[in-house]
């Protein structure tokens, strides 16, 4: 099966500072791909390049190609709004809107033109169920999303992404602000979601990458040192730098 996303010869710069160097990497469809590496190695920049979130940063510039279903998302005539509908993002800190739980999830569909209440009701319930949150909030949909626990807020943010029916979900350190129990819930949720979505996750947590992902790429100072099946990366790394990082010798 052709990868959902392919990165080919990508260099990325903030003004004159090069952050990514000749990256070639695949993101297989309906699989979880982890991007690991020490702080400042370019992980989040790489992830954000997959839906052009870096466009909003002054001086940001990408060379090379990022292909979604074999279409270069950096083509001049590409519809970026539609791209971000197809490739949704969950951030490090849960960031629910100061709105009701219902309105948080309905926000995207409304922006995209859905106005019929019965249809919004369906989308909100489906998305909250997919995010494993429905049973916890179904009787309190009118309450503020900010009143939820940290783990619930992050699942609400995942539901908000699911409501716009993406094909790819990007997760930038989605569990770093959560307790171990909430982290486990998110990891279990990821395994369920990959049945229907392609997932890319940035994580500092080696155990999480080993547990939750199918493929792993190791970045170091902007270079993709190694990429392959997660089991092989963690049990038989080909590069000594990979072995040193995953065993905690640096990072």
UniProtKB/Swiss-Prot annotation:
Main location, first listed in the record: membrane
Any one of the GO CC terms: plasma membrane
Keywords: ATP-binding, Cell membrane, Membrane, Nucleotide-binding, Phosphate transport, Translocase, Transport
SUPFAM superfamilies xref list: P-loop containing nucleoside triphosphate hydrolases (SSF52540)
A single BP term in Gene Ontology: phosphate ion transmembrane transport
Catalytic activity: phosphate(out) + ATP + H2O = ADP + 2 phosphate(in) + H(+)
ABC transporter domain: residues covered: 5-246
Entry keyword annotation includes Transmembrane helix: no
Protein localization: Cell membrane
Membrane topology: Peripheral membrane protein
Binding-site residues, ATP: 37-44
EC number: 7.3.2.1
Signal sequence, start to end: none
InterPro entries per record: AAA+_ATPase (IPR003593), ABC_transporter-like_ATP-bd (IPR003439), ABC_transporter-like_CS (IPR017871), P-loop_NTPase (IPR027417), PstB-like (IPR005670)
Function according to Swiss-Prot or TrEMBL: Part of the ABC transporter complex PstSACB involved in phosphate import. Responsible for energy coupling to the transport system.
Family named by the database record: Belongs to the ABC transporter superfamily. Phosphate importer (TC 3.A.1.7) family.
Protein name: Phosphate import ATP-binding protein PstB
Record organism: Dehalococcoides mccartyi (strain CBDB1)
């Amino acid at each position: 099966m052709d990868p959902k996303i392919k990165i080919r010869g990508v260099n990325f710069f903030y003004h004159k500072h090069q952050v990514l160097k000749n990256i070639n990497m695949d993101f297989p469809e309906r699989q979880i791909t982890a991007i690991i590496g020490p702080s400042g190695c370019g992980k989040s920049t790489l992830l954000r390049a997959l839906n052009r979130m870096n466009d909003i940063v002054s001086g940001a510039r990408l060379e090379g190609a990022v292909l979604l279903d074999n279409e270069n998302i950096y083509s001049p005539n590409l519809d970026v709004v539609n791209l971000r509908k197809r490739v949704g993002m969950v951030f490090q800190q849960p960031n629910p809107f100061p709105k009701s739980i219902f309105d948080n999830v309905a926000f995207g569909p409304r922006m995209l033109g859905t106005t019929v209440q019965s249809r919004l009701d369906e989308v909100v319930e489906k998305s909250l169920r997919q995010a494993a949150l429905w049973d916890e909030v179904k009787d309190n949909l009118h309450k503020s999303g900010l009143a939820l626990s940290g783990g619930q807020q992050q699942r609400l943010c995942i539901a908000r992404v699911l409501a716009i029916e993406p094909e790819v979900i990007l997760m930038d350190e989605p569990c770093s602000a959560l307790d171990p129990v909430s982290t486990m819930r998110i990891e279990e949720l990821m395994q369920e979601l990959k049945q229907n979505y392609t997932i890319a996750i940035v994580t500092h947590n080696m155990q999480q990458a080993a547990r939750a992902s199918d493929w792993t790429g190791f970045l170091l100072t902007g270079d993709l040192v190694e990429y392959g099946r997660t089991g092989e990366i963690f049990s038989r790394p080909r590069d000594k730098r990979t072995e040193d990082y995953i065993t905690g010798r640096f990072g």
